[in-house]
């Protein structure tokens, strides 16, 4: 979400020094980090070449954690302590969670009346903010390892439909992860940046973004470097996870299988996800689940999957219709449709979108990566690295903001789809004679009754001079910044008394809570570094063991008996060292095995060369 960037105040860059800035797509299912290198945005892989980081964190006793692929592997065996799709819980209350009994977690409210969701683990109660911070920190470390330097800051993407509470939770997670947040940017907007800069397209475009947990639709007008978001919509509780759940439910009805334990529920959901993914390329796939009650194998046709999830695709298209109506556009006025999010790989989704708009969607860029790439381009600009200042991005606010008036009604101050950053003011007056205070209740939503909208904050303006009802003039000003976050001020015009509040959602984290988490992070920084080194050492050891054992299986016959015995002894020593809590011990054993197999590697190379040259004449090689 950025206006024309010349340079940020206080950030005039040294023209000879490039700041490292990254874009982060904090996704429900997977997360990515990208950066601009040599003028091109690219996603940064981990040390094994993997770009996608599963958005999964496993909590273990004594403060230990597994993040990403290692945690994902434990989803079916330690479901209660392995938290996935935490993005769906960001800024939410327990009442907001749909069917919590179907999830393998033990939920608890952290603080009565504030509603912060906690998930109980063997390492204590964790919030979605803490889980997201672990993922963000992992991506930050990946970027710093790639560049061998600290990063200046990051642009983090959020769904366009995220409300103030969810955006604030994302900012809290970034702070907890030690990331200098340059800006929050809407995911569809990031996709528009990537496509607009890569393809130079102009006209009206729809960005259809179906991720793991959220759906967004944005209608954009692109013209000569200006990106104007003319309307947004979506569903913050619709994504690939829901397709998994619908398929799992349908198969359960067909087979009569009802998973009971948390582990069985997780295995069942994972089996449904794998089956869904297989149906992207196949007409029939087998859902296979190893449950505590026995193994389940059930063939699913793509047509069955499409039928059992058609209502979800229809929900997304209903949001598309609303967004087009808000923009005052007919579907045939849309020149192109951009698909974003891994869930758009489903054939039924692509077919439904193509049929709705009467044209095939654009799939030039990897739908998993396009959001991170756009965020990286924006981060590069905000860091002052980009010499091109010809991109103007006009974003909009997704939900109306207003205040409660007498009778529990909502008076809108800023309407949805208004371009941001923005500020709007409206005058109010007192209700009673001699009234010296005014309560301001800030709400968000499209309904006319306060009870049907989301409460954001409450504050009071005191010190109003006593006067007749209706005589006082109180100006209430709403200001929404470039991140879509709100501050509210109220000022009595005659006396000048005023009050301000930066809206902190009633179920967000307080600054004290964030500070406490940061302090905990500082206190365990050394321990975390040691834990990271230990994990890396064990990974390297496992990799060396697998490579050596594979080589022995293939070419072990080239070794003499005493050579084989020496290598076997080194393997046993390394395998024994993996159980150590000392990274140096494991590293020493790994290096010893590497050194001890050098002559074996040379023998294997000689054999390969001899086999390659067997039967060849000198003339045939010249």
UniProtKB/Swiss-Prot annotation:
The keyword NADP does not apply. GO terms for molecular function: ATP binding; ATP hydrolysis activity; ATP-dependent protein folding chaperone; unfolded protein binding. One of its GO terms (biological process) is iron-sulfur cluster assembly. InterPro entries: ATPase_NBD, Heat_shock_70_CS, HSP70_C_sf, HSP70_peptide-bd_sf, Hsp_70_fam, ISC_FeS_clus_asmbl_HscA. Keywords: ATP-binding, Chaperone, Nucleotide-binding. HAMAP family: HscA (MF_00679). NCBIfam families: HscA, PRK05183.1. Belongs to the heat shock protein 70 family. Chaperone involved in the maturation of iron-sulfur cluster-containing proteins. Has a low intrinsic ATPase activity which is markedly stimulated by HscB. This is Chaperone protein HscA homolog. The gene is hscA.
């Amino acid at each position: 979400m950025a206006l024309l960037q010349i340079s940020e105040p206080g950030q005039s860059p040294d023209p000879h020094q490039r700041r490292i800035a990254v874009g982060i797509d904090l996704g429900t299912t997977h997360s990515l980090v990208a950066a601009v290198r040599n003028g091109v945005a690219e996603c940064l892989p981990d040390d094994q070449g993997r770009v996608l980081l599963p958005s999964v964190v496993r909590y273990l006793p004594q403060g230990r954690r597994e993040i990403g692929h290692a945690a994902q592997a434990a989803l079916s065996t330690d479901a209660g302590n392995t938290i996935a799709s935490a993005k769906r819980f960001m800024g939410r209350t327990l009442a907001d969670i749909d069917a919590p009994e179907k999830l393998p977690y033990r939920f608890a409210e952290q603080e009565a009346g504030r509603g912060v969701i906690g998930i109980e683990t063997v390492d204590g109660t964790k919030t979605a903010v803490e889980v997201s911070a672990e993922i963000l920190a992992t991506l930050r470390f990946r970027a710093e390892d790639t560049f061998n330097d600290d990063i200046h800051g990051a642009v983090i993407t959020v769904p366009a439909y995220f409300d103030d509470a969810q955006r604030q939770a994302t900012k809290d997670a970034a702070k907890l992860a030690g990331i200098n947040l340059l800006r929050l940017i809407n995911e569809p907007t990031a996709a528009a940046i990537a496509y607009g800069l890569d393809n130079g397209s102009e006209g009206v475009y729809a960005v259809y973004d179906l991720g793991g947990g959220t759906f967004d639709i944005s209608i954009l007008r692109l013209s000569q470097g200006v990106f104007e978001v003319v309307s947004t919509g979506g569903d913050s509780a619709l994504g690939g996870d829901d397709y998994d759940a619908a398929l799992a439910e349908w198969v359960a009805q067909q087979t009569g299988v009802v998973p009971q334990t948390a582990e069985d529920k997780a295995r069942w959901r994972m089996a449904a996800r794998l089956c869904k993914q297989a149906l992207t390329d196949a007409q029939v796939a087998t859902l296979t689940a190893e449950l505590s009650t026995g193994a389940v194998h059930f063939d699913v046709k793509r047509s069955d999957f499409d039928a059992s999830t058609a209502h979800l695709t229809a929900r997304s298209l209903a949001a598309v219709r609303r967004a087009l109506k808000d923009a005052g556009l007919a579907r045939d006025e849309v020149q192109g449709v951009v698909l974003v999010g891994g869930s758009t790989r489903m054939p039924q989704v692509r077919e439904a979108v193509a049929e709705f708009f009467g044209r095939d969607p654009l799939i030039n860029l990897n739908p998993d990566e396009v959001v991170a790439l756009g965020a990286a381009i924006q981060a590069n600009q905000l860091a002052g690295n980009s010499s091109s200042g010809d991109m103007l991005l006009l974003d909009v606010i997704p939900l109306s903001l207003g205040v409660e008036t007498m009778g529990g009604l909502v008076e809108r101050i800023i309407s949805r789809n208004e371009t941001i950053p923005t500020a709007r003011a409206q005058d109010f007056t007192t209700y009673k004679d001699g009234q010296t205070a005014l309560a301001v209740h800030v709400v968000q939503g499209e309904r006319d009754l306060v009870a049907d909208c989301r409460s954001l904050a409450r504050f009071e303006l005191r010190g109003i001079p006593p006067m007749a009802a209706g005589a006082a003039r109180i100006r209430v000003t709403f200001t929404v910044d470039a991140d879509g976050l709100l501050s509210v001020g109220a000022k009595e015009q005659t006396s000048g008394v005023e009050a301000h509040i930066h809206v902190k959602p009633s179920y967000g984290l307080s600054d004290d809570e964030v500070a406490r988490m940061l302090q905990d992070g500082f206190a365990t920084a050394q321990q975390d570094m040691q834990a990271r080194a230990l994990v890396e050492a064990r990974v390297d050891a496992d990799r060396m063991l697998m490579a050596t054992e594979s080589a022995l299986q293939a070419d072990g016959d080239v070794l003499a008996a005493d050579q084989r015995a020496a290598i076997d002894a080194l393997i046993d020593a390394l395998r024994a060292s993996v159980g150590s809590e000392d990274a140096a011990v494991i590293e020493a054993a790994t290096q010893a095995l590497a050194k001890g197999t050098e002559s074996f590697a040379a023998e294997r190379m000689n054999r390969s060369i001899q086999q390659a040259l067997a039967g060849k004449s000198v003339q045939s090689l010249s």
